[in-house]
């Protein structure tokens, strides 16, 4: 018996995939399984309403927001640092961008030192994308100079990540904590149809939801 089961549902349009999945998910919920779904197309709105779940739709006025940097000391591990590194790289490089080994190591170092500054040295006021961005803008040039690194496009880093910093067009996305009441819900649907064609927001929001 495993608690990490997986399956894949494939079929042409109109073949009943959503109908089947509604049935499967309902049965799982009835067996006391907590359900969190990411959907495009409003396929599970009716089921969510039926079971009294929480249905959250992404809109420009009310984007889905989370603060992936707000973690406890015991939650800081290789997996979490890797997740945050992928998040930063997604904003900086996009889904198709090439990441060099130097850039990968650089961002990993900055993230690690950022948390050290907060947990060990108490030099950072709070954990958020805002404070990470502020810290990285100062620390990255220092690391580049200390190690004589070349080929780091610091201007593009500062420019692209600024969209998610305070005052930017997506300033709420990575800085506002998820409603803690959601942790008490047993059935949650995140509807992100409105950003399914956005090459940055769609993978980014999906990534932070799954975290």
What do the PLM-derived regions correspond to, one by one?
Residues 1, 42-54, 60-211:
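P-loop NTPase motor domains
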